[in-house]
Amino acid sequence: MKKLFKTAVLATAALALAATGSFAGDYPDRPIGVAVSYGAGGATDFQARIVTMVAGNEDILGQPIYILNKPGAGGRKGWNWFATEAPADGYTMSAYNIPHFIAQSIKGGVKYSADSFEPIANWGSDPAVVVVGKDSKFNTMQELIDHAKANPGKTTTSGAGLFVGHHIAALQIEKACECKLAYVPTKGGGAAAMKAVIGGEVLAGINNLSDAFRAREAGNVKILAVADLERNDFIKDVPTLKETGLDVDNSSVNFRGLMVPKGTPPEVIDKLAKQVPLMFSHARVAKRMKAGGSPMKIMNREEVQKMWADREVVLKELLKGL
C-alpha cells in the first residue's frame, strides 16, 4: 500500500513538473493585456502603446499586447484591481508609475504595496516640468514663485492626481520656496491636467516632460523648469529647478515600466524579464518614443527592484507628516 502511495505521489509530481515545463515553453500562446491605471491620451497610455508595438514579433514574445485602460481615483482603481483581481498567469501585466503607486501605498487607503507586484522591466524616465499657458504673464520660474509668495495658496497648479510625480514636485517646490501653491489634482490624469493649463483653468501646471513637449511643439504652453538634476535633451533651453534657485532634486521623476501580480509563475517572470527589455530597445520603439518627446531609460528586472526599494526610502522621508 505504501509503495502504491509513493508511486502515485511521484507520478503526480512528474505530471506537475511536465505541465510547468510545457507552460513555460508554450507561453505566451495568446495575446497579453497591459492595464494602464490612467485614461487614454495621457503619457503612460501614449507610451505603453508605443513600447509594446513590436510584442508580436517572433523574436520578442510572438503574441501582440493590447492596452486595458482602468482609470479612476488617481490610479488607485486600476492598481487595486491589478493587486486583488488580475490573474497571476502572465496574460495580464500592468504599467507601473514610480513614485505614484509607491507613494500611494505609503499614505494608505489602497490595497497594494510594492510587495504586491513583481517588476519586469523599466522603459522610461519622465521628469516633471512646470508649465504655463502660451499667453501666461509668467515667463520664468522666478516670476511664478514671486506670484506664489505674494498670493499664498492662490497660485492654482494642476497635476495628474495626489502623490503622483507632479504632486511630489509641487511639495518639493513649496518646501524650497517657502511658499504655498494651490495644487489641483485632476480626475483625468496628465491629459486633463494639461488641458486645464491650456484652457486657462489654472495659472500653472506640473506635468510630464513628454506631455509638455508635445504641447509646446503645438504652441500651447511654455515650459518654465524641469524637476531633474540636469537639463533634458528634449528641452535643452529649459533650466532645472535647481538652476532657478530652488533646491529640488529628481525625486519626482516618473519611472514607467511593466509588472505582473505577485504569484505569477517564476518561469513566466523569467521569460518576460528576458524578452521585454528587447521589446523596449527595438529600433522602431526608440524612433517613435523620440518623436513623441518621451525619454527612455531601459532597466532590467534587478535594476528595477533596486530602484523601487531606493524610491520607497526617499518617499517615506519626503511624505512624513503629510
Task: Show the residue positions of the predicted features.
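Mature extracytoplasmic/periplasmic domains
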Residues: 286-306
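C-terminal lobe and pocket-closing loops
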Residues: 125, 211-280, 310-313
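N-terminal signal peptide c-region/cleavage motif recognized by signal peptidases
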Residues: 19-21
